[in-house]
C-alpha cells in the first residue's frame, strides 16, 4: 500500500459525503427529523473542457449560500483506483491527483502552483497526464456550520487530448528586461488552435509574487505562438509570465524568474521637446529633427531588447535602416548632456 501521507486530515472526501447522504435518505422513513434552520448551499463545478496533454490547468467553481454563511470548496478527482500508485503520467485511467484540504477559495490548480513554478508538472501525488484520457472531478461546497452543516456537490469532466504539451518557450533564463520596451513572448501552440480544442485566443498574465497575484498584460491575443506585450514600466525583482487559454482552463508559465528594470520612456520622454521622427513607419531611412543643433547618439533595439543598429546622429539627422526587417523597434536618442528619449519605430518594407 502507498500512503499519500502518514496522518489523516480532518475532513471527509466528497465520495464519503455522498455515501452518507445515500444512507440518510434511505433511512428517512424511520428517523426523527429535526430542523437546524440551515439551508443548503449550491455548487457549480463549471463546464466540461478538453485540454492538451502534459499541460497544467485550473478549476474554479461557484458556490452560493441562502444564509450567507462562509463557504469552503473541495476539489477532488473521482476516478476509482485502477492504476499504479503513486500515479504516472502514462496512466490512462485511475486517479492522478490527490485530495487536499478544503479551501475558502473556489479555485484549485493542477498541479499546485508551487510545483508549476518549480517547473515540475509531475510531483509525486499530482501528476499531469501525458496521454489522452478522461478526468472526473467533484466540487464539494460546505458551509461548515457547527450546529449542523450543509453541503452541495457538482461534477465536471475534463478530457485530455493528444494535442500538447502547451508551453511557454521564451524567458527561459534569469535576465533583465527594459520596462519601456515591449516584451517578446513565444509559446508552443502544439495543436491547441485546431479541433478538438480550437483555442483561438490566449490571455497573457504577469505575476511578481510567485503566483499569489496576477495582472493582465494582454486580455485576448491570437493563439499563434508569438506576441509582443507591454510590461509595467517599473522595477520588478521576480517576474513570471503565464499564458492561459481564453474560454478554457489550461495554462503554461515561463520557466525562470526574470527582472524588469524601469526604462527611460516614461520618466524622461518630456525632456526632449520638439523632437520629430519621420517617416514612421519607415522603409530605408529615418529622419530625426531635434529642437536645436546638438550632438546625439542613437540606438535601435528590437522587441527582445537586442541592439540592432547604433551610431552618432549625422548633421542631417538621417539614419539608414535599410538592413532592418519589417517589424516594430525602439529608437533611443541620447544627447551629450545625458537626456534620452525612446520612441517606437515601425519598419515597413
Task: Name each region found by the language model.
Residues 51, 62-67, 143, 188-195, ...:
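Extracellular acidic, Ser/Thr/Pro-rich low-complexity tracts
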Residues 1-138, 147-152:
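Extracellular (secreted or membrane-anchored) zinc-dependent metallopeptidases
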Residues 45, 49-57, 174-181, 277-282:
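Short, solvent-exposed loop/linker segments at the N-terminal edge
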Residues 53-63, 182-186, 285-289:
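A short beta-strand segment in extracellular, disulfide-stabilized domains
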Residues 205-209:
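Conserved Ser/Thr-centered positions that define the repeating blades of beta-propeller domains
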Amino acid at each position: 500500500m502507498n500512503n499519500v501521507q502518514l496522518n489523516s486530515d480532518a475532513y471527509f472526501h466528497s465520495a464519503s459525503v455522498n455515501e452518507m447522504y445515500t444512507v440518510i435518505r434511505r433511512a428517512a422513513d424511520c428517523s426523527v427529523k429535526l430542523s437546524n434552520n440551515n439551508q443548503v448551499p449550491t455548487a457549480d463545478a463549471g463546464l466540461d473542457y478538453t485540454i492538451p496533454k502534459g499541460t497544467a490547468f485550473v478549476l474554479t467553481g461557484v458556490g452560493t449560500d441562502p444564509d450567507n454563511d462562509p463557504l469552503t470548496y473541495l476539489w477532488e478527482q473521482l476516478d476509482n483506483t485502477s492504476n499504479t500508485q503513486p500515479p504516472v503520467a502514462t496512466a490512462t485511467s485511475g486517479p492522478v491527483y490527490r485530495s487536499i484540504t478544503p479551501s475558502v477559495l473556489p479555485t484549485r490548480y493542477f498541479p499546485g502552483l508551487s510545483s508549476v513554478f518549480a517547473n515540475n508538472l509531475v510531483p509525486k501525488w499530482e501528476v499531469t497526464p501525458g496521454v489522452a484520457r478522461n478526468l472526473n472531478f467533484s466540487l464539494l461546497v460546505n458551509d461548515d456550520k457547527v450546529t449542523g452543516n450543509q453541503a452541495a456537490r457538482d461534477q465536471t469532466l475534463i478530457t485530455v487530448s493528444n494535442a500538447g504539451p502547451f508551453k511557454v518557450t521564451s524567458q527561459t533564463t534569469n535576465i533583465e528586461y527594459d520596462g519601456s520596451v515591449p516584451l517578446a513572448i513565444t509559446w508552443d501552440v502544439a495543436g491547441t488552435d485546431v479541433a478538438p480544442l480550437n483555442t483561438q485566443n490566449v490571455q497573457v498574465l504577469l505575476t511578481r509574487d510567485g503566483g499569489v497575484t496576477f495582472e493582465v498584460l494582454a486580455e485576448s491575443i491570437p493563439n499563434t505562438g508569438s506576441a509582443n506585450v507591454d510590461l509595467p514600466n517599473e522595477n520588478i525583482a521576480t517576474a513570471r509570465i503565464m499564458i492561459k487559454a481564453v474560454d478554457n482552463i489550461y495554462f503554461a508559465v515561463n520557466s525562470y524568474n526574470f527582472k524588469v528594470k524601469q526604462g527611460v520612456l516614461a520618466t524622461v520622454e518630456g525632456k526632449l521637446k520638439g523632437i520629430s521622427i519621420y517617416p514612421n513607419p519607415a522603409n530605408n531611412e529615418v529622419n530625426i529633427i531635434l529642437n536645436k543643433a546638438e550632438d546625439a547618439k542613437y540606438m535601435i533595439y528590437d522587441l527582445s531588447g537586442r541592439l540592432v543598429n547604433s551610431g552618432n546622429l549625422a548633421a542631417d539627422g538621417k539614419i539608414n535602416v535599410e538592413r532592418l526587417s519589417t517589424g516594430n523597434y525602439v529608437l533611443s536618442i541620447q544627447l551629450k548632456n545625458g537626456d534620452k528619449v525612446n520612441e517606437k519605430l515601425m519598419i515597413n518594407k
